Regions:
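Central helical "cap/lid" subdomain
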Residues: 39-40, 121-188, 196-198
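C-terminal catalytic lobe of FAD-dependent flavoproteins
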Residues: 221-248
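Conserved FAD/dinucleotide-binding core of flavoprotein oxidoreductases
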Residues: 146, 186-221
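Helical element adjacent to the flavin cofactor pocket in flavoenzyme catalytic cores
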Residues: 84-137, 141-142
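A short, Lys/Arg-enriched amphipathic alpha-helix followed by its capping loop at the start of a domain
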Residues: 5, 17-26
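Beta1/beta-strand and adjacent pyrophosphate-binding region of the FAD-binding site
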Residues: 1-13
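Dinucleotide-binding Rossmann-like beta1-alpha1 core, especially the glycine-rich loop
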Residues: 34-92
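Glycine-rich FAD pyrophosphate-binding loop
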Residues: 10, 22-42
């Protein structure tokens, strides 16, 4: 008997889950607003995806100015005691093209997407609820807060971020395939990255700052960890889907 998986969300994480299920011979349905995600700034794959041309690999140079402790304090203040990316990632490591992979996945799985709103309980549509409960497995890549229940705890940090969407543009005046992390007081930003021609510049968020540190910068909430019983029988994937730092 063929097993069936219901996948919630059609961003990169959702369509990667669909690709994995399809490779395993499962039938699948994808539920989401049928809108392709816009990928901003320097994002990339840390591993290739089987049976997809993901470009590369290209070697990323990852440099830290200052110490991991200084970097942790600059980005998170006293609110985070876990590791930071300069500790988690090798100084030089390979990267594959996320945008190229997502373009392929969208062309492959766009016809499988059921266009619908995914609303929190108890507002979820009866049709979607029934479809989920008839499935052998539910994979949720939508923000985990959608399923939050009273007493759940979601930890996060705010940052300012400025990401380009044009490979011919660029914000970071640095070589491609480089990431610079800065824990020193010399500059106000903490990370400048340029990968596959796309750049991201990030600053720590301070409540006292009245204006963005640069024109176009926006406030971004970055998940750290959560303690949640909501939708405990689902598999939660993606950084916002799992609400966990280090999950991409």
């Amino acid at each position: 008997v063929t097993k069936h998986v219901a996948i919630l969300g059609c961003g990169p994480a959702g369509l990667m889950a669909a690709h994995a299920a399809n490779m395993m011979g499962w039938s699948l349905s994808i539920y989401s607003k049928k809108v392709k995600s816009t990928l901003h700034g320097a994002q990339y794959l840390h591993k290739p995806i089987p049976k997809i041309d993901t470009g590369g690999p290209n070697l990323v140079s990852y440099k830290l100015r200052g110490t991991p402790e200084e970097y942790r304090s600059k980005v998170y203040g006293e609110g985070w005691d876990g590791t930071v990316s300069p500790e988690d990632l090798a100084e030089n490591h390979p990267a594959w093209d996320l945008r190229q992979a997502y373009d392929w996945l969208w062309k492959q799985f766009e016809p499988w997407i059921v266009d619908c709103d995914i609303k929190p309980m108890p507002y979820i549509s009866p049709n979607l609820w029934n479809a989920m409960h008839k499935s052998d497995l539910v994979i949720s890549t939508v923000p985990r807060k959608v399923w939050a229940q009273e007493g759940d705890l979601f930890e996060s940090t705010k940052i300012w971020a400025l990401g380009d969407g044009d490979p011919d543009g660029g914000l970071a005046s640095q070589h491609d395939f480089t990431v610079i992390c800065d824990g020193t007081p010399i500059c106000n930003w903490y990370r400048s990255a340029k990968i596959f021609g796309h750049s991201t510049l990030e600053w720590p968020y301070r409540e006292l700052w009245r204006k963005p540190p640069a024109p176009g910068a926006v406030i971004v909430e970055k998940p750290l960890r959560c303690s949640s019983i909501g939708a405990g029988d689902f598999i939660h994937m993606g950084r916002y889907g799992a609400w966990e730092k280090g999950i991409l």
